[in-house]
Amino acid sequence: MKGSRTAVALSILIVTFFVSVCARGADAPSLDDLRRKGVVGERYDGVLVVRTESADSAVRSLVDSVNAKRREIYESGAKKQGVGAQEVGKVYALELSKKAPAGTWFLGEDGKWVQKK
């Protein structure tokens, strides 16, 4: 029973995150474009990472901003559910892998990059 409550709560948290990201307007399309181009990728723990050394300061700033917002959400969800923020991040990463555009790169726990088709 506790597991199902945690799953429901984490699902609500994930939906809240997606709504907050989509509400940001101009950042969302540029983030998807950066994902498709392989400039940024998603890590197994729900952290956005820069994949290319040539990424400019605007890209790095966007990544920092997205990760700061994600950290807040992960920590808030973790506190409410009595779980670790990393657990929340991993659940988010699984959902993100389903919703991210084709071409997005994902870094697995094994250190290997895989591109979404």
Model-derived regions: residue spans:
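Bacterial N-terminal signal peptides
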Residues: 9-20
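A short, ordered amphipathic alpha-helix with a cationic face
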Residues: 18-21, 62-65
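Short, well-ordered alpha-helical segments
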Residues: 63-78
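Generic intrinsically disordered, low-complexity segments enriched for polar/acidic and small residues
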Residues: 14-15, 71, 89
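Amphipathic, charged alpha-helical segments and their helix-to-coil junctions
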Residues: 26-61, 81, 85-117
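Bacterial N-terminal signal peptides that target proteins for export
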Residues: 1-10
